[in-house]
Amino acid sequence: MSGRDFGYVIQSSAALWNRLSTFSQRGKALDTRLADIKKALGKPYYETSDVLLYHGDSLELLKSMPQQIFDLTVTSPPYNIGKEYEGVLSIEEYISWCETWMSRVHRATSAGGAFWLNVGYVPVPNQGKAVPIPYLLWDKSPFYMIQEVVWNYGAGVASRKSFSPRNEKFLWYVRDPLNYYFDLDSVRDPNVKYPNQKKNGKLKCNPLGKNPTDVWQFPKVTSGAKRSSVERTAHPAQFPSAVIERVIKACSPSDGVILDPFLGSGTTSLTARKQGRCSVGIEIREDYLDIAVGRLEAEAQSLF
């Protein structure tokens, strides 16, 4: 190990120790935050020491949420394309609806917190067949946008009159562009340490691995008798846990509280638990909440 690499390891270890040493100080604050949420929203549909799930309309529940309570929100709202689990609004109504709930998420986000929004494509009458929803929403919240991340999921629906769609977008926002949590080292790719770059005749690299870039390669959660994903549930638009894991690791502290106001099948809460974070989920459909509860219970049982 070179002197520079050794110094980097020492600095990284010191940073880790500083985070660990503050855990006990923030532990009480964590309990207080969860208690404040229960006081504001009432009895949860499901509750454990690290998960609160609520059944109801996100727009209404977010209105009652305490201010600056969450370190990270990561969610995927309905895309407004008429799937069986969502209604269809006009484009103007959909944008207005998103503006409202995003402003309420902003109010509930901590000073150093982040908001990750996953959205796909929507037809716009007389203008476009598949308009990326980020083009309609990117500046419709009080947050500051850091970056667009492209999720390339590989397999998908084939198309005869256009290129087959193989990606969705994540928009990464923060409350304060000068002070936000970001732990790049926790999500570096350790299998790519030596890219083909040199400086002064020496390889440029980080000993922990490569920055994963803004294009993420993760397979979609698939269905079907021969190709169904292991984590597949009855929800028709399910997040892969690997995507959410990267977001949680990079953009929330180890004792953070995470929100998903459109919880669906519970992937955000399940992944947050596996990463040692607490979470709050809101879902309007009780059958999806029951799926989420079942996944959380199964994961808890697997630990014994």
UniProtKB/Swiss-Prot annotation:
The keyword Protein biosynthesis does not apply. Keywords: DNA-binding, Methyltransferase, Restriction system, S-adenosyl-L-methionine, Transferase. One of its GO terms (molecular function) is site-specific DNA-methyltransferase (cytosine-N4-specific) activity. Pfam families: N6_N4_Mtase. Gene3D superfamilies: Vaccinia Virus protein VP39. One of its GO terms (biological process) is DNA restriction-modification system. It comes from the Bacteria. InterPro entries: DNA_methylase_N4/N6 (IPR002941), MeTrfase_CN4_CS (IPR017985), RM_Methyltransferase (IPR001091), SAM-dependent_MTases_sf (IPR029063). It catalyses: a 2'-deoxycytidine in DNA + S-adenosyl-L-methionine = an N(4)-methyl-2'-deoxycytidine in DNA + S-adenosyl-L-homocysteine + H(+). Its EC number is 2.1.1.113. It is an enzyme of class 2 (transferase). The keyword DNA-binding applies. Belongs to the N(4)/N(6)-methyltransferase family. N(4) subfamily. This is Type II methyltransferase M.ScaI. It comes from Streptomyces caespitosus. The lineage of its organism: Bacteria, Bacillati, Actinomycetota, Actinomycetes, Kitasatosporales.
